[in-house]
Amino acid sequence: MKPLRIWFACVLGVTISTLLGWSNAMFMALFPVFVLVSLNRWNTGLFVQLILGIFWVSVQVSLIIGFLQPYPVLMLIAVGIMLLFKCFAMHHKPIYVFGYVGLLIGSILLNFGSYQAFDLENFIVGIWIATLMTLPICGLAFYCFPDPIEEGPIMSIQGQDKEPKAILEQTALGWLVAMVAFVIFQVANLNDSLSAQASILVILAPMTLVGSLMAAKIRIIGTLAGCMAAMAIQFVLYDMFDNPILYLVSYAIAAGIFCRWLAKDPVWAGIGFSAISALTIPLTTNMVPGQQDAFFAILYRASSILVAVIATSMMIWLGYKLLKSMPWLFSLPRQEKG
């Protein structure tokens, strides 16, 4: 039933946002998918983490940009402190989602908020609506496609409780790469590179060199699969793309394939999530029926993600080597045995 739950929630989110003309339709689809991939049964705590994490980081970013944007040094310090706490939270299972969504959404908001012409408040409200809608959408998915009651775990998330030294090293690695990415997106004119920025943070999530390199491969494979599916939908529908029924049916068919992957092992789940993201974002943000197609947007998305993944992998490797060359930085005082 899990693949059906994920598929139902994903398609329902896109359907609601399409029929009502809401912006940020991609979040309406991806937030429920992100939650349902981690859940085997209903868990209120995970939804609380998601909602609080997004609401809190939105407030943080609004305050940082509103008060500190004219002062780059102070803004850099404030962002560094904020991202450090997000990276640290990701190492603890009870608050992993709170930290991860804070790191991801916070970085996106900081990037877009740096452009004067961008309406940050409207974007934040759209994210809030998508976040709140995740609760009823997932609830309806669990109601329509329940699983038999089992003794298995309620949820499975990536947060890891490790030794203090390992936590410090991996937190430093994640924070270092996140800060470099923040500076790059602040200095360069990359306001149309949402997918590339998200890819940086997605492959950073494991907080380890080996895990991040594996995540990079998964991200590339999933993105190529999703982009090919999005192009196929556009070519098949052609000038009939402005028909909402045909559009939603085509999207549902393509999403169904990737949602089956999401219910498999972690590797397939990673490929599936990257694919569903690559399918959803260009078709919900760049396509304007009768006016603008998404062909070049899909090509740009694939190429920008490829460049971002390669560059991030190099940054993670360099950061790993740099931190390993300074073992004294993470040395903890030894406790004397009584």
List the model feature ranges, each with a label.
Residues 1-98, 111-253, 257-338:
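Alpha-helical transmembrane segments and their membrane-interface boundaries
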Residues 105-106, 110:
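Hydrophobic transmembrane helix module of multi-pass membrane transport proteins
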